[in-house]
C-alpha cells in the first residue's frame, strides 16, 4: 500500500507565507536550503514568507516534495493565497467562494484532449 503524504502541520486559516515560514522553522532549516530545493532565490522565498510574493506552481510542487507534503494540498494553499491577494478588495469574492463550495464540479476545467 502506498504511503500517504503528510498534510500541513498548521491549520489553513494561517496565511500561506506565515505557514511556510513556520514549516521551515519547525525543521530548523535556513531559507537558502528550502530555496535551493525549489531552484529559486532565497530573497524571493523570503518575500513569499512575508506575503509579498507568490510561488509558481513548479516552486510549490518542489517545496511540497522537499517537505514530503501532499503536493495537491500544498498547491491548493498557494491558489488560496493567490485568490486572496488578487481578490481581497472585491466584494464579490465571498460570493464566488460560496459558489465554488456549493457546486465545485460546475467550475472544474475539463481536459479537452481526453477521449
Per-region residue spans from a language model:
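Short, charged recognition helix plus adjacent turn
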Residues: 2, 73-115
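A short, Lys/Arg-rich alpha-helix, primarily the initiator
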Residues: 2-26
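Core residues of bacterial helix-turn-helix
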Residues: 27, 38, 48, 66-67
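DNA major-groove recognition helix of helix-turn-helix/homeodomain DNA-binding modules
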Residues: 5, 39, 56-74
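Residue-level recognition of specific faces of alpha-helices
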Residues: 19, 44-47, 73
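Short basic helix-loop element that most often maps to the first helix and adjoining turn
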Residues: 18-37, 62, 90, 96
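The DNA-recognition helices of helix-turn-helix-type DNA-binding domains
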Residues: 41, 52, 67, 77-82
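Recognition helix of helix-turn-helix/homeodomain-like DNA-binding domains
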Residues: 39-55
Amino acid at each position: 500500500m502506498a504511503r500517504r503524504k503528510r498534510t500541513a502541520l498548521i491549520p489553513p486559516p494561517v496565511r500561506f507565507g506565515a505557514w511556510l515560514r513556520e514549516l521551515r522553522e519547525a525543521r530548523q532549516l535556513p531559507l537558502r536550503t528550502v530555496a535551493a530545493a525549489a531552484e529559486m532565490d532565497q530573497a524571493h522565498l523570503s518575500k513569499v514568507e512575508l506575503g509579498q510574493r507568490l510561488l509558481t506552481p513548479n516552486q510549490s510542487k518542489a517545496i511540497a516534495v522537499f517537505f514530503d507534503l501532499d503536493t495537491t494540498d500544498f498547491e491548493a494553499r498557494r491558489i488560496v493565497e493567490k485568490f486572496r491577494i488578487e481578490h481581497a478588495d472585491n466584494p464579490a469574492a465571498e460570493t464566488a467562494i460560496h459558489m465554488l463550495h456549493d457546486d465545485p464540479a460546475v467550475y472544474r476545467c475539463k481536459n479537452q484532449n481526453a477521449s
